[in-house]
A protein has these predicted regions:
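N-terminal membrane topogenic signal
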Residues: 1-15, 72-76
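Alpha-helical transmembrane segments
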Residues: 11-24, 82-83
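Juxtamembrane "helix-exit" motif on the non-cytosolic side of transmembrane helices
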Residues: 25-35, 90-99
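Loop-to-helix transition at the N-terminal end of transmembrane alpha-helices
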Residues: 35-50
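Hydrophobic cores of alpha-helical transmembrane segments in multi-pass inner/ER membrane proteins
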Residues: 46-61, 136-154
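Membrane-interface junctions at the ends of membrane-embedded or membrane-associated helices
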Residues: 58-71, 153-162
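Hydrophobic alpha-helical membrane-insertion segments
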Residues: 77-97
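Hydrophobic alpha-helical transmembrane segments
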Residues: 117-147
Length: 172
């Protein structure tokens, strides 16, 4: 086993961490500073790497907590990537799927909104909906799912490889 052969290892890899930074900077700085079509595309692009790896990491950590995790699976990676792609396609092209997505994420985000309101000494907010722009041209970022797939598969491959002995120069 390698150093990354643990549940959620893909959450420690550069593509995931870079996607987190891009999402944070884009959504909290760039969209406020200079909102345009490209800030939306940038969020979508980072999301194609972020969401499947997050989904896989949460799945693996849940299995590990239950004592049922048996290692990173290429199949789980593929399912998480496919699920992310399918949901993204639906919410960008289907009005009913988009409304469901907005309401569901608004409901899931509400507890965080309550904590934020409490922290700021504000009244409890109503359950809201998240913003979503239905734009079929956003589908152009789908090829970036390949980076998430590659990252997950690489973690899986490394987890099954035998540990490499230290080089002779490092043992001295």
């Amino acid at each position: 086993m390698t150093a990354h052969a643990h549940a959620g290892a893909q959450l420690t890899r550069a593509p995931f961490l870079l996607a987190v930074v891009v999402l944070a900077v884009n959504d909290h700085v760039l969209k406020a500073w200079c909102p345009s079509w490209w800030t939306g595309k940038l969020s979508d692009a980072a999301g194609m790497v972020f969401f499947p790896l997050l989904l896989q990491g949460v799945w693996e950590l849940a299995l590990e907590t239950l004592g049922r995790w048996q290692g990173t699976s290429r199949r789980v990676t593929a399912v998480c990537v496919a699920l992310t792609g399918a949901v993204f396609c639906l919410v960008k092209t289907n009005v009913h799927a988009a409304r469901w997505y907005q309401a569901t994420w608004g409901l899931l985000r509400w507890p965080l909104d309550v904590v934020a309101a409490w922290w700021r000494h504000q009244p409890v907010p109503r359950v809201g909906v998240v913003q979503l722009v239905m734009d079929p041209s956003d589908l152009m970022v789908l090829p970036l799912l390949g980076l998430a797939l590659w990252t997950g598969w690489r973690v899986s491959r490394e987890a099954t490889q035998a540990p490499q002995p230290a080089p002779a120069w490092a043992v001295r």
